[in-house]
């Protein structure tokens, strides 16, 4: 890869030299996920946004040795986008317009929200406590444009799927060679979750079998929209599903509906929709700060009793175990979660995709840290006074 970007570096010099374009395409570079999520919150759209973000990876530690395992990260696509810019001499958006949108007659596809809005872009939504709210003005982070920020419609994406199902041909134009399309859809790296094989990932597509029929697919989302593409290559059938809402406040409906339709196109029964409690968990999130407030009043009530009746104030092991260390655990856990989210950049991802969870984490984590210190000090002060 350093052939195209000689200056490219991650924290490990050997890994920097080993990474190839194919590693990026197959998501086997070892680059981690959450730094790419944090990059989505960088809305600097001045020239050179992609190169700035890629240069910022010079201190990044990779997740696994290069080429050894599949680990999805949008950083791979952002680096690939920069390679496209470097080798073509064109901005990524211009390259996509000239070499994909124009030849595929994708006349309602855009790289900026402003252009898409002028053509009637649907209003996107984010979920707060599993309820959808309009979010029409989330900008596109220019530095992450190559990793999934392009805007399209069902008709245009149908043109894209036609080329993928027709050996790279659309109308009279050969957009990509038939061998190139076969390589894209081959699947190169095992995708495992919880140790179980999900499918094979390669060059943007997940290859799986439904029954004995091979299908390829890819889903994705931005904070206020989500999408799914599915193909049955041998039958030359495909589906595109576009949803003007993010999926994080709901079960994974975009993917499950998309895979269900793909299964039907393959002549197979769709998998049942999984029972998902995420939306109910999200609705219960406001109970966390409420329970914290209840805990404060309960503690103050106990402390007032101890102050009025010093004789009932416990001491020794009971004081430390039951009244100090045990209550410290949930408070320090909540505070620790917030510290972890901020130190790893996870908070930026949560801000964009799960704003309700982000605010609960900030409020409850900050409150828990402050209250843990204050509560311990109050108890120790009263214990010394009592005895």
List the predicted regions and their residue ranges:
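Active-site SXXK
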Residues: 77-85, 236
